[in-house]
């Protein structure tokens, strides 16, 4: 019964979005994003979650610019990058021998590969090519201002979402 109520609420929220001028524009942007790519389960899942979160937020006119901006960011990212970003609450802490300076514990380089190896291990990924892709994704997420690494030599390091990373995370998480 609860599942039926959830479906009915989701349908009503979508109906509200589609009958609102600004909401309709956002829904159509998501539909266009889906049609621009071959079917991909992760891509579909992330856009489904974003659509649900937009529809649940209501206030389409007030939040239009924010939604439009974040959908634009999502559109530029790979499904794999979105999956890693959406998994932020499960990112492991990690160790590595950092040789360099940090400002306030913020590390700017050398952490991508050590994190990626620990993250891949946690996800039972052993394929070196997939791990290399994770390294590339983590580097992109850092360079685009979605994540930062914090820690000090001799302690555990951790990745954290920036303000912009948190903004996207809200679209990708249930």
Where are each of the predicted segments found?
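Charge-rich, amphipathic alpha-helical segments
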Residues: 1-58
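Long, helix-rich, hydrophobic modules that act as membrane-proximal anchors or helical bundle/coiled-coil regulators
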Residues: 37, 41-174
């Amino acid at each position: 019964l609860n599942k039926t109520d959830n479906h009915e609420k989701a349908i009503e929220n979508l109906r509200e979005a589609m009958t609102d001028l600004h909401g309709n524009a956002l829904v159509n942007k998501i539909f266009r994003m889906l049609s621009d790519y071959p079917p991909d389960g992760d891509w579909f899942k992330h856009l489904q979650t974003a659509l649900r979160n937009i529809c649940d937020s209501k206030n389409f006119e007030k939040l239009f610019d924010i939604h439009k901006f974040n959908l634009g960011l999502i559109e530029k990212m790979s499904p794999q990058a979105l999956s890693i970003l959406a998994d932020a609450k499960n990112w492991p802490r990690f160790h590595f021998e950092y040789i360099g300076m940090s400002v306030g514990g913020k590390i700017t380089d050398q952490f991508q590969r050590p994190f990626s190896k620990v993250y891949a291990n946690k996800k039972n990924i052993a394929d070196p090519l997939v791990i290399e892709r994770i390294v590339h994704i983590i580097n992109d997420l850092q360079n685009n201002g979605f994540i930062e690494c914090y820690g000090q030599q001799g302690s555990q390091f951790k990745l954290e979402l920036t303000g912009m990373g948190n903004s996207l995370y809200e679209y990708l998480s249930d």
